[in-house]
Amino acid sequence: MKKLMIAGVAGLCAAVTFGLESANVVGYQTKTIPAGFSLSTPTFQDIGAEGLDLQNFKLADTAAGDSTEMIQFLDADGQCTEMWVWLNANAGMEPGWYDFNTWAPIVKTVVPAVGYLMNSVSPVDMVVSGQVKSGETTIALPAGFSVRGNNTPADIDLQSIKLADTAAGDSTDMIQFLDADGQCTEMWVWLNANAGMEPGWYDFNTWAPIDYTVKAGEAFLFNTVSPVEMIIPSAL
């Protein structure tokens, strides 16, 4: 099986604060990003929007800000398609995300539940803010690999993340969680009536039902042979 090699895992939620603005639940969340690579996804979206502006992924003042903190987005083959670096006064720039090659400022919206690779030479805090998405998130998964995650600011049970009825459900839809060396530590497969099972996530090797908590903002590697939709529950 093809593996995506990374060197770290996503930092867990350090703090989350909520408020109420009109009908929107708004707030912010602080995550500690470890040294090395990690998989993550934003837990808020911009108020009145359907995603979060990448410039609202704020790194703390302790960030090196000299192009050694970067975000990468991947295609269905696990290859990097976009790479942005965090620059600040240490690079003579206003704090923000810039193009890796040109250092030009960038505009990018990250839609709910889309994950990314974060790379940092040292641990650093990241703050995301905005509104909590109301209602569940339904997101398309292409054939091949994709990075998806828990886009709510709360921990959720993996079994609450569902695949659409069109899923093959015969062990060809799978989720992997990775360790600090980029090796798979947990692998779960989606089974349904096509495998003679109740729809849900099961151990890859034994097909035993599993109990696993996906942390707020934690992302994972998903692999499928055919496009399918994933449904992530609402935090509200």
Question: What is each PLM-predicted segment?
Answer:
Residues 17-67, 75-79, 106-172, 212-236:
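A short, polar beta-strand/turn micro-motif
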Residues 4-5, 60, 90, 164, ...:
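Residue-level detector of intrinsically disordered/flexible regions characterized by low predicted structural confidence
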Residues 80-112, 186-216:
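A cross-kingdom feature marking solvent-exposed beta-strand/loop segments within repeated
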Residues 1-21:
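Sec-dependent, cleavable N-terminal signal peptides
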Residues 151-202:
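Intrinsically disordered, low-complexity segments enriched in Gly and acidic/Ser/Thr residues
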Residues 70, 101, 174:
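Short acidic-hydrophobic catalytic motif
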Residues 72, 78-92, 122-130, 179-196, ...:
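Extended intrinsically disordered, low-complexity coil regions enriched in Ser, Thr, Gly, Ala
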